[in-house]
């Protein structure tokens, strides 16, 4: 493979040559028993990787697409979302929440720092009416 650029970003990621060669083959039909068997095996392996007995979900999308799907199913217009912002992804959660009509409150720290758990606890304790529907990070 000629292009051996090392990408140090969230995505896209480098794809090994053997995977690229497999992708050049005809796809397995997604309604076939062969696909079902592969899908089940992948799900079981993901459970092992994540050390869980719970269901895992494969989402054919970018990370932002998964964030959109999560918030569109968890918040309604007018709901309050507390977004922990320590960088671009935390800010993205807030913007996506706002795009769905939610009210995004940001608990932010400068890039490279971390949110103090005591500050988060304090903010949640202040929410005596339980208006915050979800916390994003």
Region roles according to the model:
Residues 49-50, 72-79, 124-131:
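Glycine-rich phosphate/diphosphate-binding loops that line cofactor/substrate pockets in enzymes
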Residues 1-2, 7, 31-32, 110, ...:
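Hydrophobic N-terminal alpha-helices or hydrophobic patches in metabolic proteins across all domains
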Residues 42, 46, 70, 120-124:
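Generic hydrophobic alpha-helical segments
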Residues 7-9, 57-60, 83, 106-107, ...:
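General beta-strand structural signal in soluble alpha/beta enzymes
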Residues 4-60, 64:
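A glycine-/small-polar-enriched, mobile loop at the entrance of the PLP active site in fold-type I
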Residues 115-137:
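Active-site phosphate-binding strand-loop segment of PLP-dependent enzymes
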Residues 53-86, 90-94:
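Conserved beta-loop-alpha segment that forms the PLP phosphate-binding cup at the N-terminus of a helix
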Residues 92-103, 110, 121-123:
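Active-site-proximal loop->helix
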């Amino acid at each position: 493979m000629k292009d051996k650029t090392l990408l140090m970003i969230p995505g896209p990621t480098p794809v090994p040559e053997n995977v690229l060669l497999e992708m050049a083959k005809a796809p397995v039909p997604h309604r076939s028993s062969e696909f079902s068997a592969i899908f089940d095996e992948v799900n079981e392996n993901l459970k092992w990787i994540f050390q869980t007995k719970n269901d895992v979900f494969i989402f054919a999308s970018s990370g932002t697409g998964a964030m959109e799907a999560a918030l569109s199913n968890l918040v309604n217009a007018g709901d309050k979302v507390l977004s922990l912002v320590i960088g671009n992804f935390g800010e993205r959660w807030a913007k996506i929440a706002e795009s769905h009509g939610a009210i995004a409150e940001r608990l932010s720290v400068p890039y490279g720092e971390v949110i103090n758990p005591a500050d988060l606890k304090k903010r949640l304790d202040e929410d005596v009416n339980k208006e915050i529907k979800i916390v994003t990070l």
